[in-house]
Amino acid sequence: MSSAIVLSAQGLVKKFGGIVATQNVDLQLTAGARHALIGPNGAGKTTLINLLTGVLPPTAGRITLEGQDISHLSPHERVRRGLVRTFQINQLFDSMTPLETLALVVSQHRGQGGRWWSRLGQDAQVNQRAEDLLTQFHLEDVMHQATREMPYGKRRLLEIAIALACEPRVLLLDEPVAGVPAGEREELLATVAALPSDVSVLLIEHDMDLVFSFAQRMTVLVNGAVLTEGTPEEIASDPRVRDVYLGHAESQAVPHG
């Protein structure tokens, strides 16, 4: 894995009136990184992700993507430049099939936009890319099924496939196993583990088994500030991290190293 920094947040601050939601947060992702962001409920993880993706403007601080300042770019422009976030299922087109959905996303990413509706099945390159993603995410058996009829685990796989259709340099993977039944988790976890090595991944997840099996580095956020950063082994053995999780009565405490 290269040590080149792909995504960098420097001194990020976000205030809502008199409330400080993030406090001078620094975060760096290297090329091909497998990095996890963890913290108890209310730690500021969602605010930080919204800052990185442009949903919220920072009160102070700077965000760079491959050395370019993106602090004030729109979410759409950040996606175009390669910073992509997975979105939860209610933002998918429930009446569309996975094949239609991925063909639409691929078409839009390639600048074809609305022409997709009149060209479905006619663009071989778009179709091939959509079918490749369906194969990669083991969705071939439901490719012609309405999304609303798919098992929940398959829908979560489709969310990740949609993000990869945007050809990200950095993928923000937002709680991929949340709500997934136990019987559907294994396939999802295997797919997450097999994400392309050239894509830097920031995982936001409460499932500590997934976090510790996936991440090569971890950042712990508490009360809007970075408590510590390190390898999974360093995080697991840090008494401050354990105290924070036990103090917040998390359903899954940090595993012992």
Task: Describe the function of each predicted region.
Residues 2-257:
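Glycine-rich phosphate-binding loops of nucleotide-dependent enzymes
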